[in-house]
């Protein structure tokens, strides 16, 4: 299927799981709330001792949004992570819980870039189709992780995924299926110092990568409208108003879920 997917860690209906950690993330992570999840590239992010402790029981689903009747973009949201070990009361699972929670608290703080540099999303998604949509970023352990949600019609979905993968080397990024969506995550090391000029260069670099991806996908052929969609404009406006002015918009009214991923097509 996808050569650089971490399929061994994917969630599915036959996999047992239990909630092992819950964290409250600041509102700058709420761009991911629109997708109901923050995928976590465990193999890339974990230190060796962390992998030994809980790396084998995690999945690409990462942190899932805990939905409630008042999920507002202007409020900090609760996120949960599942463990896929066979015994939630085992010594390894219990000892990993606190380490995992501390890891998650550090990880979500890397989303500050989404509020500090609101222009980044607007620039990267400008005149780009919703099928490859920049969602948000996480700065973590000196690497900038750049998240794109992938959404294509089911008739061409597999061909599009393979076309995208042909453009993305393991050093450049990864393409994979999470719980609710398909994702492309690019990795940039040049803007790890959180410098404006470096981040601006990163944004131009990202657009060039996505241009290359779009050209490859259009060979299938697939018709992609290279315009900023009205839906994306609404998401940008809602996020800006929530982060800058505290205006509440219900997440459920703006959320994005890829039915292909959710139904495991």
Curated annotation (Swiss-Prot):
Subunit field text: Interacts with E1B-55k.
Entry keyword set: Early protein, Host cytoplasm, Host nucleus
Pfam families, A to Z: Adeno_E4_34
Family listed: Belongs to the adenoviridae E4 30 to 34 kDa protein family.
Principal place of residence: host cell
InterPro entries: Adenovirus_E4_30/34
Assigned GO CC terms: host cell cytoplasm; host cell nucleus
The protein, known as: Early E4 31 kDa protein
Location of the protein in the cell: Host nucleus; Host cytoplasm
Protein's job: Plays a major role to prevent cellular inhibition of viral genome replication by nuclear bodies. Assembles an SCF-like E3 ubiquitin ligase complex based on the cellular proteins ELOB, ELOC, CUL5 and RBX1, in cooperation with viral E1B-55K. This viral RING-type ligase ubiquitinates cellular substrates prior to proteasomal degradation: p53/TP53, LIG4, MRE11-RAD50-NBS1 (MRN) complex, ITGA3, DAXX and BLM.
């Amino acid at each position: 299927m996808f050569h650089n997917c971490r399929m061994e860690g994917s969630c599915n209906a036959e996999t047992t799981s239990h909630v092992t950690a819950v964290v409250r993330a600041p509102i700058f992570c709420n761009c991911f709330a629109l997708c109901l999840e923050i995928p976590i590239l465990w193999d890339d992010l974990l230190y060796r001792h962390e992998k030994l402790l809980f790396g084998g029981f995690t999945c690409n689903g990462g942190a899932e949004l805990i939905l409630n009747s008042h999920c507002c973009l202007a409020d900090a949201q609760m996120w949960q992570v599942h463990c896929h070990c066979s015994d939630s009361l085992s010594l390894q699972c219990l000892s990993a819980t606190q380490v995992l929670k501390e890891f998650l608290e550090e990880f979500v703080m890397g989303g500050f870039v989404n509020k500090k540099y609101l222009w980044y999303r607007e620039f990267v998604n400008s005149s780009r189709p919703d099928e490859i949509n920049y969602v948000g970023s996480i700065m973590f352990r000196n690497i900038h992780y750049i998240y794109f949600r992938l959404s294509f019609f089911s008739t061409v979905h597999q061909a599009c995924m393979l076309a995208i993968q042909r453009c993305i080397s393991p050093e450049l990024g990864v393409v994979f299926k999470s719980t609710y969506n398909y994702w492309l995550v690019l990795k940039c090391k040049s803007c790890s110092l959180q410098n404006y000029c470096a981040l601006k260069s990163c944004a131009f670099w990202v657009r060039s990568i996505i241009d290359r991806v779009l050209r490859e996908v259009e060979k299938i052929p697939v018709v992609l409208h290279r315009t900023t969609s009205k839906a994306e404009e609404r998401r940008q406006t809602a996020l800006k108003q929530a982060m800058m002015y505290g205006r509440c918009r219900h997440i459920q009214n703006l959320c994005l879920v890829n039915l292909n991923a959710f139904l495991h097509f």
